[in-house]
């Protein structure tokens, strides 16, 4: 009997592998097997794959094993029963996890429409106990998890202090100096040679090559000596190398200082070579050695870049842009007004025929804390945003080639003033003027001046908002209005008392629409769509803007766009810059921090300035990436502060600790008695400076400043929406599509367009008393919210929610009769569906009706265009999956911008897209709800739609919109 049991037990072990895949799905077992989920053969199984078949041998093993199991004694079954229940729960859990993974993969491959996304969130909220409970639980869990991850990362960083931080790109005192100058000779094909000298902590990597900006590798100026174990020897070698570079450069600098006339036709090319071999003047040599001593006093590597160009006269702006000048790029990166100064300089050179390069030096008179040599034409010395190794990698990735393209596009745009504002720095050039006149520098936060014809006309018709933060000033969609935004905080409020007096209140939005495109409604709409896409998915939005020519395809151009343009969610800016997976995002972050000057600032105050532009919040890895770049830039700007610590990485650890302190001190989820005290803050930073403590006075100062003033991000367009959301009280029913506001009004992509007072008309054929059914209308870029004044106080007004309508599929109609002379009718106009009247309004006067309907129609067109773009993208993806081997598309290349199929292939797919099922594009709740009512209809998402997917072909070269 015992032998038989051992034999059956061995058969059970063999049958477990065969019955595994069959029994996990819960299907009815075969009559031959007699197994089920409760059998012990299903217990020892891992993740299972459905759909597998069983061989005859497997059936035999299974039946015998099952027979042997149930033929056994009763006590054996009772002892195994708890284990079987545990096995069932484990298998069920694994099946649920697999289902979640499949749903995630599907969600990544197909983008749902906005109404389906809202419905998805609504279903999750219903599943987990309702909106309030779900939101509170999700917020608590997310906050706790992020705090846990931040603390975990902080402890990891503390424990890794002894490791080499070069892999983390904290090159704390790394100085990159770029010397460029222009001279009197005229050359038609200029090139730049980049020569780099780098000394790391181990004394290696001396003389690493840096590709030139034209993409070609230049000859090495210095050979790499053998690595030395003594760091002092490496510094000595650096001094020698630096001296040789300074000697070779000194004569060229001296020639530039001689202020030779532009009338000289040419200078032999050997002059430059002779200048490199001659000895420099003692004054210049001594000065550069003093700079060298200051640089080599810190610990990290020092990198020298010398961009040498044959001396050439200033070319006209249309020709100068063809030369990929690193000097132009560097000057454009200067914070404050240096970029504008450069454009003013270029204009002077274009106008003056006899000016020498020495007279161009006022463009560099702006004081900079970085290393600089006075009175040199176009001389820039720029600290790095990256290590020398990574810079070489970026050059190999042709980011410098993109920079050259950016320079060429700038040059072409400068040549035509009407396109100029969008390629160069937007703050220094007047709009649509026949000549380019320099203007005085303005701060980074200042906004563009506008041509006021359309603005004055619209302003005479309606009252503008006093608020001028990012959201309230950036959103009007009218065709005749271009409004300007500012970051002044003195007029941020919504001015509720003003709203209650005005019948129409338009939100300004100058930075959303470029004055150069004031007559191009479609172009401005595309720009706003790009901003909306960025505020939903940053990478997708940047790609959209680059493809349409609004943003240069360079890290420098994208960095300028993120810092200078309004209408971008600061939260999404942080999401984009904190992406560690994409090298382009990392390059943009380097350029962004290079725009900021943290000289002579305390660490917490510099961090406050950094966080004012970029919201440092989210996943711990992204926060670490942002703080890493900030710390690098801070140490470059403050080499004296770095020398106060034993290890430069202490700056990074301290900055990370400040973020933790600010989060802990101002988080509403942390109880007051559990908030971080001063002693806790000091204790957390004990021994982080290579075993030494940071001076207690420094930590006390940081703690007190954070306690008195929170690290906050500047307001953006979302801030204004949040203020409106706080003013709306009462029950907000959760209804999809047209019946409710939903759980959250303030979203990163939502902005306020206008505020208007209208009167609701229940029945257009019946009269009503004057002033009855007064409604306060808030028009957002994707939503129309109808409210009623709930309570009016002296300094505030609250509104009760009535209805909300999605703008997708909305149609705006006008009507007039003897009772309502200024009637407005809103209907649902999905192609092929029944027209449904949503609501009727009567405006107080014809002017308000015109302005409101213009804004509403433009907002509806914007939403429709975004949905069309989404469906186009899905069509291309579906076409690539269903018809990957289309013969007519085999010879067509993919677009370089995003890798999508060419437009000709896409247009062909519309005519012969029978392989695509209609259900694949029915991603709207309208499609789902109307499917049962009508047997066959056309929708915006189907191939039978009458919507024409014709690409927009601009009649002018793509330029950067303001």
UniProtKB/Swiss-Prot annotation:
Enumerate the GO terms in the molecular function aspect.
Answer: guanyl-nucleotide exchange factor activity; lipid binding; protein kinase binding
The protein depicted here goes by the name IQ motif and SEC7 domain-containing protein 1
Q: Where is the composition biased (Basic and acidic residues)?
A: 273-292, 365-375, 429-445
Q: Bias regions of kind Low complexity — which residues?
A: 8-19, 470-488
GO CC annotation: what is one?
Answer: nucleus
Q: Do you know which Pfam families this protein is assigned to? A: IQ_SEC7_PH, Sec7
Is Nucleus found in the keyword set?
yes
